[in-house]
Amino acid sequence: MTQLIITYQSDSKLEESEVFLSELNRIKKEEDKFAKFSSLSDLRAIVKKGEFRIVSIYLSSGSILAEIFTFEFLKEFYGVLDFGSVLKVNILALDSIDKVKAFERNLLFSGFIKVKKLKGDGLNSSDSDFEIVIKAEKPSWKPEEGKVLVDDIDLEGSVPDIKNYVPLGQGKESCKSKERACNNCNCGRADLEKEIGIEAARKVYQEKVETGTARSSCGNCYLGDAFRCSGCPYKGMPAFKPGEKVSLANAEGDANDRTVDMNLIHEEKVDLITTTFDDDGSGVSNVQSKGGVLKLNI
């Protein structure tokens, strides 16, 4: 495995070091190449001359490291290296641990992976006599290899059919066995409890579920949306004549025929009927008081 060994041209302290010379003699093989660089363009030209799996850089101090290998420098240097290359930075003397930590962060931000500090804080051991050895790798894959094309995904098959959706909650049938309305009630029972009391509302909902009967509290259902209540089961349907047969669709998509009978009964002392409607159009009635009213049956 061919190795490229490089040093900084102006790093005079390194060249005077006997530790570096002995290290160079120890690791250098015949197929390895030794070179010096003074700028990024020099380093780019040196790396492009051959296919090097390992690039070892030797520096005398952390100050030299911070001066040369800035984030912008590392980004450019990252693009020069072959995929799968290993970068080893050897520092002779540790004069600033903060600069070394900043260099490690810049390696990660530049795209390198598996950044390790092999010496200097007792984390790992190394055969090198240098005080700090930092190792990093350039990924062996290209960024495009991890990209998934949208065309490869079967969007239609990944989205379940809306007909098979199960609605949240148990539905109005669960109200029959409950003592009182749910905390997040949206079927109207909570409002009915406030008006007529908990026990009376429970009985009304029992009758409502068992019989499915409903009565109008306004008598305006047949006139159209402009005259209908917000919870009217005929909301969205055109106006119709009293007594006309109207077909409503329930939650499952089936159709239930309901006869709308808006016949008026003469005014007399009768019970006042309060009615609450569900989203599916069913309604319940409760006797509240005595008064002169018109009874309207739906």
Curated annotation (Swiss-Prot):
Ranges for region Linker: 143-162
Domain of life: Eukaryota
Protein residues bound to [2Fe-2S] cluster: 175, 182, 185, 187
This protein's UniProt keywords: 2Fe-2S, 4Fe-4S, Cytoplasm, Iron, Iron-sulfur, Metal-binding, Mitochondrion
Subcellular location field: Cytoplasm; Mitochondrion intermembrane space
Pfam families assigned: CIAPIN1
Annotated stretches, region: Fe-S binding site A: 175-187
InterPro entries xrefs: Anamorsin, CIAPIN1
GO cellular component labels: mitochondrial intermembrane space
Name of the protein described by the UniProt record: Anamorsin homolog
